[in-house]
Amino acid sequence: MMGGSSSRIAAGLGAALFVGYCIYFDRKRRSDPNYKNKLRERRKKQKAAQEKAGLSRLPDLKDAEAVQKFFLEEIQLGEELLAQGDYEKGVDHLTNAIAVCGQPQQLLQVLQQTLPPPVFQMLLTKLPTISQRIVSAQSISDDDIE
């Protein structure tokens, strides 16, 4: 019995210390005069990184016309960049197009027939990450609405 009560006391004491630690650093953070500036800078960097990834100009996935326009633009940009030899950016644009495509399997089959195997392999490796970023970007925009 004695071991059980002492472990409860230790757990309670640990929890109290943790809460105190959180409160201390929260107050320290809020009283920092540069906190808002640091927060603005961090948000600015995140926005710049998102724009660099091409996700800030994602269409509203509920607007079929905007999605179709985005899809066609991404395919065209991807093809142009691949023709210029910029495989990395070209594949990025093609993965954006695949991510918003209504029938991605058919598009992948067409791309597999038309793209050189190394470029198609690069496309396949980037697909999961771009799809995940689009899903997270869409959920962020849904959170902004609420």
Swiss-Prot record:
Residues 37-47 have a biased composition (Basic residues). Residues 1-5 are mitochondrial intermembrane. It holds the Pfam family MAS20. The keyword Glycosyltransferase does not apply. Gene3D superfamilies: Mitochondrial outer membrane translocase complex, subunit Tom20 domain. The chain crosses the membrane at residues 6-25. GO terms for biological process: intracellular protein transport; protein import into mitochondrial matrix; tRNA import into mitochondrion. Residues 37-56 are annotated as: Disordered. Keywords: Membrane, Mitochondrion, Mitochondrion outer membrane, Phosphoprotein, Protein transport, Transmembrane, Transmembrane helix, Transport. The keyword Disulfide bond does not apply. The modification Phosphoserine is found at S141. It is found in: Mitochondrion outer membrane. It is a single-pass membrane protein. Its main location: mitochondrion. Residues 26-146 are cytoplasmic. One of its GO terms (cellular component) is mitochondrial outer membrane translocase complex. It comes from the Eukaryota. One of its GO terms (molecular function) is mitochondrion targeting sequence binding. Forms part of the preprotein translocase complex of the outer mitochondrial membrane (TOM complex). Interacts with tom22. Belongs to the Tom20 family. Central component of the receptor complex responsible for the recognition and translocation of cytosolically synthesized mitochondrial preproteins. Together with tom22 functions as the transit peptide receptor at the surface of the mitochondrion outer membrane and facilitates the movement of preproteins into the tom40 translocation pore. This is Mitochondrial import receptor subunit TOM20 homolog B.
